[in-house]
Amino acid sequence: FRLAKENGVGTVLDTAGQPFTREDPFFSKLTDLMENTDLVMLDLKHIDPEKHRALTGHTNENILAFARYLNEIGKPMWIRHVLVPGVTDDNENLHGIRAFLDTLSNVKKVEVLPYHTLGIYKWESLGIPYTLKDVDPPTADTVKRAEEILGCSK
């Protein structure tokens, strides 16, 4: 990233934010990285820590702490939310994410990414069970509702 910035190339970090900690050596390396990062794209899957754990195997505490850290340092951030019917599309989750985002001043954009099944073959080729194989993509109305709740702008 440093070389990119030195050569006038914009830099974007696309992350789920899971490994965040304020402990070194991670934090000092992250601080250096943030000095050379123009924008962070952060995925927020679920606002409830236990539902997030059920979905990903980890709670979201590190992710939310990372978002707060980015806000503290004034790093511009885009939030992306994968909308999975029956998993991440309920009103409680969407309104909870919106309430969290309202505590941050550095969010420049919010995007809803509708769940799709295009990558199932990757899981199958690795012999990993794909637990969402019976989930259909969200309808256009469901996506629109989520975008309205989350305050997405086109």
Show the residue positions of the predicted features.
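Conserved AdoMet/S-adenosylmethionine-binding subsite of the radical SAM
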Residues: 1-113, 118
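Radical SAM enzyme core and accessory elements
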Residues: 152-154
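A structural motif corresponding to the C-terminal lobe/cap of the Radical SAM core domain
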Residues: 99, 108, 124-149
